[in-house]
């Protein structure tokens, strides 16, 4: 068995910007055989990464708080489109404040929507003050965009009316989404040119715990053309794009691939991720958030890590954000993920 201990020799540290309301953190820099960025790019392209990327250690994450959406979603307040968000301490997240509405009906989007001027924000100043010192070129940088196409519609006019608009006003939605896609592409360009992003993480939840909000055919007719614009724009800017979509949305994965997404950040508790990866892993990378609880013994935690690598890493299109909530294990589960996947990928 090959000895990888020297690859886990700490040679320095990285400062990691916080996202989703978290503080900045410090993570170790290891003596890896290739840079974490090169390994992550290999994973996204399906070109034989050497280990399963742990995005907490291997990626830079950017969610500038000069974006009203980021501040409102993380802490409460008013987002880019005038929606009031209320922070809920128990869930450590924000929800639209009850009674808030900015769009009376979808047919009035031209008259009622006030489009945010992205040029009003001093992006370069924000980069210089908050990110320039901590975005290592050794690590892939992804830029977080919340409130995607469907999410934004529900925020503006209520969830129920957004669903009704899909059925009753597809032409009006198409016009609104044309404009919203253009606005997002302008934001993507800022992410690339100012923050040097390598990937967009685009949030658009589309399911409940047991099913999708709408049929694959609705996705094909209404969302697919817009997503194809967004993914093409990212690729033309030499960026990857990962769609974060919670809920039981496995039925939409073939359409995500057709849309041109490079990866899907899916909800483990609502999807059979192994089945999805077995069927689509050669065409779409999977980025997963998973936790190791305080109650798990060391052996139990190791077994969970090994299971993820075995089941989701078969096509080597798997990355994760691994959180271990037990501080006193005596060994690093991030290092265990590295060692186990490093050996597994040699097989």
Predicted feature descriptions by range:
Residues 45-47, 51-88:
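N-terminal accessory/capping or targeting/presequence segment of soluble
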Residues 1-55, 59, 114-347:
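Active-site loop segments of alpha/beta catalytic cores
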Residues 65-69, 89-93, 97-98, 155, ...:
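Short aromatic-enriched loop/helix-cap "lid" or pocket-rim segments at secondary-structure transitions
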């Amino acid at each position: 068995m090959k000895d990888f201990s020297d690859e886990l020799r700490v040679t320095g540290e990285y400062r990691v910007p916080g996202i989703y309301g978290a503080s900045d953190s410090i993570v170790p820099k290891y003596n890896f055989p290739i840079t974490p960025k090169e390994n992550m790019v290999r994973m996204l392209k399906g070109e034989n990464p050497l280990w399963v990327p742990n995005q907490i250690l291997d990626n830079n994450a950017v969610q500038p708080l000069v974006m009203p959406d980021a501040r409102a979603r993380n802490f409460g307040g008013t987002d880019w489109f005038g929606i009031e968000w209320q922070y809920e301490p128990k869930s450590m997240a924000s929800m639209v404040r009850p009674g808030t509405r900015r769009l009376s009906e979808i047919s009035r989007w031209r008259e009622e929507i006030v489009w945010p001027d992205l040029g009003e924000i001093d992006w370069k100043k924000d980069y210089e003050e908050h990110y320039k010192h901590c975005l290592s070129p050794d690590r892939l940088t992804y830029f977080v965009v919340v409130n995607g196409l469907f999410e934004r519609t529900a925020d503006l006019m209520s969830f129920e009316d957004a669903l009704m608009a899909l059925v009753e006003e597809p032409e009006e939605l198409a016009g609104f989404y044309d404009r919203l896609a253009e606005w997002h592409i302008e934001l993507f360009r800022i992410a690339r040119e100012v923050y040097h992003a390598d990937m967009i993480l685009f949030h658009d939840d589309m399911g409940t715990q047991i099913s999708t909000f709408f049929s694959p055919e609705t996705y094909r007719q209404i969302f697919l053309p817009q997503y194809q614009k967004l993914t093409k724009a990212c690729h033309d800017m030499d960026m990857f794009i990962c769609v974060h979509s919670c809920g039981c949305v496995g039925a939409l994965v073939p359409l995500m691939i057709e849309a041109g997404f490079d990866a899907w950040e899916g909800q483990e508790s609502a999807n059979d991720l192994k089945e999805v990866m077995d069927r689509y892993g050669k065409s779409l990378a999977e980025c997963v958030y998973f936790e190791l609880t305080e109650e798990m013994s060391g052996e139990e935690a190791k077994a969970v890590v090994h299971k993820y690598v075995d089941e989701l890493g078969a096509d080597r299109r798997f990355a994760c954000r691994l959180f271990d909530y037990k501080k006193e294990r005596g060994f690093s589960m991030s290092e265990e993920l590295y060692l186990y996947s490093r050996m597994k990928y040699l097989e």
